[in-house]
């Protein structure tokens, strides 16, 4: 399938979290919004059609995952990572990364435990840690030779204070 990644889409004044919050967050409107994982490509026509078809139904209750969802997950895991997963093992397939990390933190830690997160990072990770009653331990990433790297000395020093989990994203 060919796709047009070159046509710019103006998302200003569309209630876009990425493009319409710069004054609120940064106090200026000339910021290049690389702070949120949001793509600026037009949605693929097949996705638009599927959403429109579902939206045409008058009731928006909770839905169940259908077999095509599980087939897509199993196919992706096999193609991308070379391993096969049984359908039964996907019974608890979380709906997103933040949800999955939240469940993991609740299983591996208890309120009051220390959780280390490298900075800068994705804002919802911090909220997930603190709203769950865990103590956020920030460790700075270091900009070196044009890329971010870990400050292992800082991480080791902070881990010695009783950090239970290091969240990498």
Task: For the regions a language model picked out, list residue spans one by one.
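Conserved core of the PLP fold type I
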Residues: 60-169
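N-terminal small-domain helix-loop-helix segment of the aminotransferase-like
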Residues: 2-96
